């Protein structure tokens, strides 16, 4: 896993502990990157089984994504 993906996983985890809905815009703001950059990374992470998109809650870590985050902390 790349350090960039690790940063995204940690960011998404941290946002999830603070707000109800994890949005593309929130991730971009916290990571200080453009929304299109977030969209591309999110697509990759969904295809790798690290995230899922929920209509009401935004982006959520899968069990695999959660496990990887716990390994990072």
Predicted regions and their residues:
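Short, hydrophobic-biased segments on the C-terminal half of alpha helices
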Residues: 42-43
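Key DNA-contact positions within bacterial/archaeal DNA-binding proteins
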Residues: 36
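A short, conserved structural fragment
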Residues: 46-56
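N-terminal helix-turn-helix DNA-binding core of bacterial DNA-binding proteins
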Residues: 2-33
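Basic, amphipathic "hinge/linker" alpha-helix immediately C-terminal to the N-terminal HTH DNA-binding motif
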Residues: 57-73
């Amino acid at each position: 896993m790349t350090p960039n993906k690790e940063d995204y996983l940690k960011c998404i985890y941290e946002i999830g502990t603070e707000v109800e809905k994890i949005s593309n815009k929130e991730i971009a703001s916290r990571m200080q990157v453009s929304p299109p950059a977030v969209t591309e990374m999110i697509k990759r992470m969904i295809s790798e089984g690290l995230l899922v998109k929920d209509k009401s809650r935004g982006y959520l870590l899968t069990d695999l994504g959660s496990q990887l985050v716990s390994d990072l902390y």
